[in-house]
Amino acid sequence: MRKDEIMHIVSCADDNYARHLGGMFVSLLTNMDQEREVKLYVIDGGIKPDNKKRLEETTLKFGVPIEFLEVDTNMYEHAVESSHITKAAYYRISIPDLIKDESIKRMIYIDCDALVLEDISKLWDLDIAPYTVAAVEDAGQHERLKEMNVTDTGKYFNSGIMIIDFESWRKQNITEKVINFINEHPDEDFLVLHDQDALNAILYDQWYELHPRWNAQTYIMLKLKTPSTLLGRKQYNETRENPAIVHFCGGEKPWNSNTKHPYRDEYFHYMSYTKWNTIGNPAINQ
């Protein structure tokens, strides 16, 4: 990729997670190559006006505005929800359809419960052709592809951080295929991992595998899972020593007082530079 190329980064949040998205954006903007240009997008999962204002004020301190994207929520009326996963989690599926500017060829999607600790241009500049997405294998070592009768082989990716190639995605009508899969399986006992299950069911053989440093999941950071291969164990050690993106997936959120996550202090560090640093944020004030 050219160094003068604009990097397009998108995330999604509801009102409860808007503050954590602010922290993620601060970490990204702080640690990126300052000679590169970035555009930020937020899929609006119901963020209230005051929190939108705080988000915008947070990133404008770095000279970077936010473009908010609206999803047709009717597309996801049959999507399975749970106590900790709302329909907003599915909205990433619509990303290539929400972007009308044909000059934008790809985007990086990053979950809002993450910290970007390395220059994001290193990820942006990766050539992932001929694949549709690039992602990290899910550290839970799930047998979801087999359990969903998709395939007996292949790896299952975590959808929290993805490079999305728009041309490949649109050419294959991936959004339509994923939504059809969701509508065909409106059962929480089937779509156990929600949007991630549906994305994997369609893209299981079309994704480029990234080093786990680019999605340092809680399973890895807390040594809750051990890969079966020597290479896998080596990569997990490298990830713990030097994570590029820390993803606070699962229940070990840094804003919970009882968390054992080793990057909890870094979370509070980046949150201190947001507009939630002292206002109405129990995570900061506890």
Curated annotation (Swiss-Prot):
Keywords: Glycosyltransferase, Manganese, Metal-binding, Nucleotide-binding, Stress response, Transferase. UDP binds at residues 12-17, 111-112, 247-253. The keyword Kinase does not apply. The keyword Transmembrane does not apply. GO terms for molecular function: glycosyltransferase activity; metal ion binding; nucleotide binding. Mn(2+) binds at D111, D113, H247. Induction: By different stresses such as heat shock and salt stress and by starvation. InterPro entries: Glyco_trans_8, Glycosyltrans_8_dom-fam, Nucleotide-diphossugar_trans. Belongs to the glycosyltransferase 8 family. This is General stress protein A. It comes from Bacillus subtilis (strain 168).
